[in-house]
Amino acid sequence: MPPAPLITIVDDDDFLRNSLNNLLRSVGMRTHSFSSAEEFLNSNELHDTDCLLLDVRMPGMSGLDLQRQLNASNSRIPIVFITSHADDDARARALAAGAVAFLYKPCRKEALLEAIDLALNHKVP
């Protein structure tokens, strides 16, 4: 049996990271979490990640900047953005650059799990 999908959470909000970790583990997924894009890029999780849950606005490198860097390196990690800032321009840029979904905090559990499922089932090898 293949291992459970690894969902990596990159968000500067400690409470949200912990909540997402608990939710995703409760439905059988493995998780890793990071408080910044830089921390994620410097980790060993980059190549093992099956789906990336990514905040848009963070200190240092933004989620959109991380997406650009991953795209430039030909990364195939599907990205689901989660943000508390209603920003139509950021949403349009993220989706145009290949994000699977762009959700607003707080989002419904069902919407998040549906977006992750979509990302996992449309992952490019």
Briefly describe each language-model feature range.
Residues 14-32:
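Two-component/phosphorelay signaling modules centered on CheY-like receiver
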Residues 33-51:
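Acidic, metal-coordinating helix/loop segments flanking the phosphotransfer/catalytic sites
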Residues 35-36, 62-65:
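Acidic catalytic/metal-coordinating carboxylates
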Residues 55, 83:
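Active-site residues of response regulator receiver
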Residues 58:
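Receiver (REC) domain active-site loop signature in two-component systems and cognate sites
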Residues 73, 84-86:
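Short, conserved "switch-loop" micro-motifs in signal-transduction and mechanochemical regulators
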Residues 89, 107-116:
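C-terminal output helix
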